[in-house]
């Protein structure tokens, strides 16, 4: 849910709360207050990362960028949301050729916890590619070594091998 939809739900809940208080339905008031509290908490801790992730998977990068821009303070996101936030910000920056900003976001994402190894592997592969562009081969091999310790998909393993071949060719 985006911020606008959450605010509409909160406004309707406040109207319902006023009705419940006026008619002495105090047990309903507790549920409505819980709904309002959850809406505020989810806006603060979840943000629009889930919607942005869906748009990102559909390769709608403008919508992804707009949804991520709705998040006022990414430091307040839950760790499981923050990692995807940083990953998507890094990919958007990479697509717009802002290499240093992309590296910053991917480095933040690499320090956050990931549920699956192949997700963290994509972050490390992106970091290796960025440093390959910068011709910082020592850092590339460090990222490749970290990525090889993870359980990766066959496609990711092929990408790692191609990057390693490029590093060996240019060293």
Please place each PLM-identified region on the residue numbering.
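Alpha-helical segment of the N-proximal tetratricopeptide repeat
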Residues: 45-77
């Amino acid at each position: 849910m985006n911020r606008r939809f959450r605010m509409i739900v909160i406004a309707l809940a406040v109207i319902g709360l006023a009705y419940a208080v006026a008619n002495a339905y105090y047990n309903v008031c507790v549920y409505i207050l819980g709904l309002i509290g959850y809406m505020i908490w989810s806006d603060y801790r979840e943000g629009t990362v889930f919607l942005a992730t869906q748009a990102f998977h559909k390769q709608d990068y403008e919508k992804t960028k707009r949804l991520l821009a709705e998040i006022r303070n990414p430091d307040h996101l839950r760790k499981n949301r923050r990692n995807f936030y940083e990953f998507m910000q890094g990919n958007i920056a990479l697509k717009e050729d802002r290499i240093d900003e992309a590296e910053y976001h991917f480095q933040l994402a690499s320090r956050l916890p990931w549920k699956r190894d192949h997700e963290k592997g994509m972050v490390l592969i992106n970091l290796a590619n960025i440093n390959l562009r910068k011709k910082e081969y020592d850092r590339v091999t460090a990222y490749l070594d970290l990525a090889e310790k993870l359980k990766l998909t066959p496609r990711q393993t092929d990408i790692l091998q191609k990057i390693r071949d490029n590093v060996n060719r240019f060293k």
